Curated annotation (Swiss-Prot):
GO biological process assignments: mRNA export from nucleus; mRNA splicing, via spliceosome; nuclear-transcribed mRNA catabolic process, nonsense-mediated decay; regulation of alternative mRNA splicing, via spliceosome; regulation of mRNA processing; regulation of nuclear-transcribed mRNA catabolic process, nonsense-mediated decay; regulation of translation; RNA splicing
Gene Ontology molecular function terms on file: RNA binding
Effect caused by changing residue 136 to R: Complete loss of nonsense-mediated decay activity
Location of this chain's protein in the cell: Nucleus; Nucleus speckle; Cytoplasm
Designated name of the protein: Protein mago nashi homolog
GO CC field: catalytic step 2 spliceosome; cytosol; exon-exon junction complex; exon-exon junction subcomplex mago-y14; nuclear speck; nucleoplasm; nucleus
Principal location: nucleus
Expression (tissue specificity): Ubiquitous.
InterPro entries attached to this UniProt entry: Mago_nashi (IPR004023), Mago_nashi_sf (IPR036605)
Length: 146
């Protein structure tokens, strides 16, 4: 059933170049929406939309299932701060989870947190998701997403 899956990821901050962010979402019908806003050197916002095949959606679900992110809780994760924020929302089957934390610079930040095991799951899942999305956008539109 296609209506049992949704994913949205956001990472951003407000700084001297304004509101800079990366956001993408996969909708139940297979629509991938992507936005990348950087005002550095007067860059313009990149917005792209495309539909992905059912097999891509199935692979996305597999990546999420394998990560076991649905077993995690962000209560002990660093809260968003002046450096930035990350948000991950997933609906998969009858589960609806939402995480909010600060930007993570490296595994050092993960290891120094109050919940390194849980934050590590989040960190690696986000890396996998970004890699997949950048590949899909790059292949579909022949652009460099970052």
């Amino acid at each position: 059933m296609e209506s049992d899956f949704y994913l949205r990821y956001y990472v951003g901050h407000k700084g001297k170049f304004g509101h800079e962010f990366l956001e993408f979402e996969f909708r139940p019908d297979g629509k991938l929406r992507y936005a990348n806003n950087s005002n550095y050197k007067n860059d313009v916002m990149i917005r792209k939309e495309a539909y992905v095949h059912k097999s891509v959606m199935e692979e996305l679900k597999r990546i999420i299932d394998d990560s076991e992110i649905t077993k995690e809780d962000d209560a002990l994760w660093p809260p968003p701060d002046r450096v930035g924020r990350q948000e991950l929302e997933i609906v998969i089957g009858d589960e609806h989870i939402s995480f909010t934390t600060s930007k993570i610079g490296s595994l050092i930040d993960v290891n120094q947190s109050k919940d390194p095991e849980g934050l590590r799951v989040f960190y690696y899942l986000v890396q996998d998701l970004k890699c997949l999305v950048f590949s899909l956008i790059g292949l579909h539109f022949k652009i460099k997403p970052i």
